[in-house]
């Protein structure tokens, strides 16, 4: 039990950037995605009553296709949307095409797409 208490104390002392990096490292180590886990957990709550609506796509992935000419503005928007640090956001933008946000609703995906396109990026919804 003392090990668990120490672990809780250590995790509580992490900064937001360190916590985001830890989450990314755990996702890579375990081969999972935190966004997918949230989507799976939210899925059963809808129940079987939504079966007719299942034909229409309800979850979207916002994919940064290209940064365009205003790369700095796009990096700022990616940071605002994802909460990533400067280096991580820069790597994501320079590594396009890459997903920015996964498992988002149609409305949220449209808003994020508009935000990124306003900054100068080319964006796809999948």
From Swiss-Prot:
Forms part of the ribosomal stalk which helps the ribosome interact with GTP-bound translation factors. Is thus essential for accurate translation. GO terms for biological process: translation. Belongs to the bacterial ribosomal protein bL12 family. Pfam families: Ribosomal_L12, Ribosomal_L12_N. The keyword Nuclease does not apply. Disulfide bonds: none annotated. One of its GO terms (molecular function) is mRNA binding. One of its GO terms (cellular component) is cytosolic large ribosomal subunit. InterPro entries: Ribosomal_bL12, Ribosomal_bL12_C, Ribosomal_bL12_C/ClpS-like, Ribosomal_bL12_oligo, Ribosomal_bL12_oligo_N_sf. Homodimer. Part of the ribosomal stalk of the 50S ribosomal subunit. Forms a multimeric L10(L12)X complex, where L10 forms an elongated spine to which 2 to 4 L12 dimers bind in a sequential fashion. Binds GTP-bound translation factors. Signal peptide: none annotated. The keyword Hydrolase does not apply. Keywords: Ribonucleoprotein, Ribosomal protein. This is Large ribosomal subunit protein bL12.
